[in-house]
Amino acid sequence: MALWRTNDSKVYLPPAPVSRIVNTEEYITRTGIYYYAGSSRLITLGHPYFSIPKTNTRAEIPKVSAFQYRVFRVQLPDPNKFGLPDPNLFNPDTDRLVWGCVGVEVGRGQPLGVGLSGHPLFNKYDDTENSRFANGNDQQDVRDNISVDNKQTQLCIIGCAPPIGEHWATGTTCKNVPVPQGDCPPLELVSTVIEDGDMVDTGFGAMDFANLQATKSDVPLDIAQSVCKYPDYLKMSADTYGNSMFFHLRREQIFARHYYNKAGVVGDAIPDKAYIKGTGAGRDPISSYIYSATPSGSMITSDSQIFNKPYWLHRAQGHNNGICWNNQLFITCVDTTKSTNLTISTAVTPSVAQTFTPANFKQYIRHGEEYELQFIFQLCKITLTTEIMAYLHTMDSTILEQWNFGLTLPPSASLEDAYRFVKNAATSCHKDSPPQAKEDPLAKYKFWNVDLKERFSLDLDQFALGRKFLLQIGAQRKPRPGLKRPAPSSSASSSAKRKRVKK
């Protein structure tokens, strides 16, 4: 859409024309063929606060927390190489097939529960909620063992591109002048890809705690050396092609439980005109005003669950109405309502004593999660015209490459050399090496890969989500053969009736 804009000169010139972004429904034809696809039970287990490195007697234990993002990269089969029920459905010379996601259900196992997080040496100075008097001595180590129930979050983002998150990180000065030691560094809002295992906002903000908190004790253990990301809804909603987020489900809940301030020297002193100086211990000098609250997610109920429910996609929030480009789908999930941490105790000696002694037992903690993904996909067709191919190439050039569209060179009339053994010491070096396999552009990111290439089925009535979808569209189930005898044909009449003759 072209808009007029003003400039510094006195003459107003129209802006350069901008290509129009079209909705996928304008160039995609939807067929009446639907497929069901579902994953197996997806389980992960590990330590909820940090990863434990590998030792000689034990394998590495990963970090698995309820406050991590679970980003599933769902791999779909190529519909152009799929065995279709109707071979005349499309013309391979002019058409291509794509998948359209019309239904999804994310299943969650395990019971509801609250998993605590905390720090054995939490930077807690004064109780500023019920303070009797300020400590007045910030030279001693007054850190304490504090645990909290973090912010409650349920989140599900559906798209065909990786989700985008935002967080506060260390910025740079304008002239690259180093920040003096002890001064507050400049901050910058950074947008990055959300990967599987990244930490969510637990109530302490979305920031790079590893680089912005040198005490390593201002937040709980699970995020003290991590980066907490918050979904960048503004950027994903403004995505030009709408691939990052077809739609999303979100529920957040938090309140402040306790109020503290931080121990340490206050970097930015309060102006003298902002208060009247006090007298006595603890009031002159005044205590720290760096206040911080411990969050709480409050009560958890099954009435507020967004998972284990089917969702039908009729109209996406962006221009992509559920089309799975590159035969992939990204499901981003967060569910802190099932954050129970499993505490495990083992005896140090084979024989357990009759009296309890803490030194005779070892305590461990683990956290496990359980997911299941189910989808309903609709087979869609694209008629490739010159305009559509140019549009798709602008959006993502790899789409046409996967469809084997490219420039075909004319056959050469000259005689060329072809060596049998190319890589050996007797043959001269050949610079033109054979083409390597194409690299995955998302290989540098970490996702939970779910392969559904062999899990598609046309029998929707054999699956729970498929039956719900058939009920949604008003379609009838396929009759099961052999359960009833066929009704007799109307042409096969019983014995012929006699014609009554009047006397």
Curated annotation (Swiss-Prot):
Gene3D superfamilies: Major capsid L1 (late) superfamily, Papillomavirus. InterPro entries: Capsid_L1_Papillomavir (IPR002210), Capsid_L1_sf_Papillomavir (IPR036973), dsDNA_vir_gr_I_capsid (IPR011222). Residues 476-503 are annotated as: Disordered. The keyword ATP-binding does not apply. One of its GO terms (biological process) is endocytosis involved in viral entry into host cell. Keywords: Capsid protein, Disulfide bond, Host nucleus, Host-virus interaction, Late protein, T=7 icosahedral capsid protein, Viral attachment to host cell, Viral penetration into host cytoplasm, Virion, Virus endocytosis by host, Virus entry into host cell. Residues 484-495 have a biased composition (Low complexity). GO terms for molecular function: structural molecule activity. One of its GO terms (cellular component) is host cell nucleus. It holds the Pfam family Late_protein_L1. It is found in: Virion; Host nucleus. The keyword Transport does not apply. Self-assembles into homopentamers. The capsid has an icosahedral symmetry and consists of 72 capsomers, with each capsomer being a pentamer of L1. Interacts with the minor capsid protein L2; this interaction is necessary for viral genome encapsidation. Interacts with protein E2; this interaction enhances E2-dependent replication and transcription activation. Belongs to the papillomaviridae L1 protein family. Forms an icosahedral capsid with a T=7 symmetry and a 50 nm diameter. The capsid is composed of 72 pentamers linked to each other by disulfide bonds and associated with L2 proteins. Binds to heparan sulfate proteoglycans on cell surface of basal layer keratinocytes to provide initial virion attachment. This binding mediates a conformational change in the virus capsid that facilitates efficient infection. The virion enters the host cell via endocytosis. During virus trafficking, L1 protein dissociates from the viral DNA and the genomic DNA is released to the host nucleus. This is Major capsid protein L1. It comes from Human papillomavirus 82.
